[in-house]
Amino acid sequence: MSFWNSLSITTRYSRLPRCFFTYVQPTPLDNSRWLIWNSELAKQFDLPENVHNHSELLDAFSGETVPSVFSPLAMKYAGHQFGCYNPDLGDGRGLLLAEIKDKKGNSFDLHLKGAGLTPYSRSGDGRAVLRSTIREYLCSEAMAGLGIPTTRALGMMTSDTPVFREGYETGALLIRMAETHIRFGHFEHLFYSNLLEELKLLSDKVIEWHFPCCLGEDKPYLAMFNNIVDRTAYMIAQWQAVGFAHGVMNTDNMSIIGQTFDYGPFGFLDDYEPGYICNHSDYQGRYAFNQQPRIGLWNLSALAHSLSPLIDKSDLEKALEQYEIKLHDYFSQLMRKKLGLLSKQEGDTRLFESMFELLSQNAVDYTRFMRALSYLDSQDKQTVVDLFVDREAATLWIDLYLTRCKLEVDSFDMRCSKMRKVNPKYVLRNYLAQQAIVKANEGDFSDVKILSTLLASPFDEHPDFERYAELPPEWGKRMEISCSS
């Protein structure tokens, strides 16, 4: 039995009609070699922890040899990009290789990004560059470390293949894992193409594969949509609580199971700046940090329109009305945890709002503030107060906060201990990613490996790596990132 045949691998998506995808063989890069292998993630799927003794892994994931159990395909979908419908989308550089089951029996997609040309590449070359591959690997693992729903990265490879973007860069490959790669845009493609039988089939399969709890409902398609609304609200609440800006929330970048998906021009907040724009192509600020909750609703409305042949309009409207309620509830729960507040009290929302106003007015680093708050000593507030220009206003807010804390049953030490488990010391600031990329382009991958370790456990102190928790230099603040990948 071959190595791959010994694993639990399926190809369910390839059994769908051909309007869903096109079979495509990967095009190998020159001299592909491992840059990093996620051994902790690999263990969950009975994959080797060390890739260097397993040439089958290199051959398969580089595209040199496609195992017989794989059925590489490029998915067809559509989507609204910056609010405009685009029917000509699909996997332009990535291939769904197969699905693999973890030790608990859950199926995950094996997806190869940077695999070469597909029928949906449009004017692209089907490649991914080292720069964007490093960013996606690090951010997906950072989000996993933070406990935020996300796709994962099993590994990445570098190569000797030059790829032209603004200049010549190094071609690379990312092995992405997700419970599904089905996007809002899959439903939009079928709806706008008037493929209504296929739309129903996709909905049936999504329920079967990802929302089996809906099978016994009187209105299973509505139940599916309610679940998508709920998961999307939870995901975006998590983004807002941790200070994450996705950067390009097009509907083709929205997962139907509420996982953070397609890492491109993302950014974590440095100074608390509500209108932070991380995508330098977002001239109008459509996807600014403080617009993400609104765009979540816009995208869900676009999905609802695509599901209208299956679900009554009034039911869709009621489901959409729940989004903002759910988002507010999830966000409030998360902020209470970050502030060490277990009980729900009148005035909590105003406490949060006044905190955000103060952080914004004083340009205080969001991650550093929340972490410092988890060490706050009621007898010595100075460490937190010193983060602010307006120390008097900061002192007033801290006094309000400490008064609120007295309503809790936890001791001071217990409360702070819990806060340190939800307020990270380390996040993937864009300047850290950029420094790692610069080194990697020179053949030094040490920062990539250090960051991948730190970001997997971002709440721990890691005293030997304090410099990765430092404030960004001026050049590293408010970095806007290109969509080029």
From Swiss-Prot:
GO molecular-function terms, A-Z: AMPylase activity; ATP binding; magnesium ion binding
Cysteines engaged in disulfide bonds, as pairs: none
Pfam families: SelO
Keyword terms: ATP-binding, Magnesium, Manganese, Metal-binding, Nucleotide-binding, Nucleotidyltransferase, Transferase
InterPro entries in UniProt: SelO
Catalytic residue positions: 252 (proton acceptor)
The keyword Hydrolase is annotated on this UniProt entry: no
Coiled coil location: none
Binding site for ATP: 90, 92-93, 113, 125-126, 176, 183, 262
Needed co-factor(s): Mg(2+); Mn(2+)
Known catalytic reactions: L-seryl-[protein] + ATP = 3-O-(5'-adenylyl)-L-seryl-[protein] + diphosphate; L-threonyl-[protein] + ATP = 3-O-(5'-adenylyl)-L-threonyl-[protein] + diphosphate; L-tyrosyl-[protein] + ATP = O-(5'-adenylyl)-L-tyrosyl-[protein] + diphosphate; L-histidyl-[protein] + UTP = N(tele)-(5'-uridylyl)-L-histidyl-[protein] + diphosphate
Enzyme Commission code: 2.7.7.-, 2.7.7.108
The protein's enzyme class: transferase
Residues engaged in binding Mg(2+): 253, 262
PANTHER family named in the record: PROTEIN ADENYLYLTRANSFERASE SELO, MITOCHONDRIAL (PTHR32057:SF14)
Function: Nucleotidyltransferase involved in the post-translational modification of proteins. It can catalyze the addition of adenosine monophosphate (AMP) or uridine monophosphate (UMP) to a protein, resulting in modifications known as AMPylation and UMPylation.
Entry's family note: Belongs to the SELO family.
Protein name per the record: Protein nucleotidyltransferase YdiU
Organism name: Aliivibrio fischeri (strain ATCC 700601 / ES114)
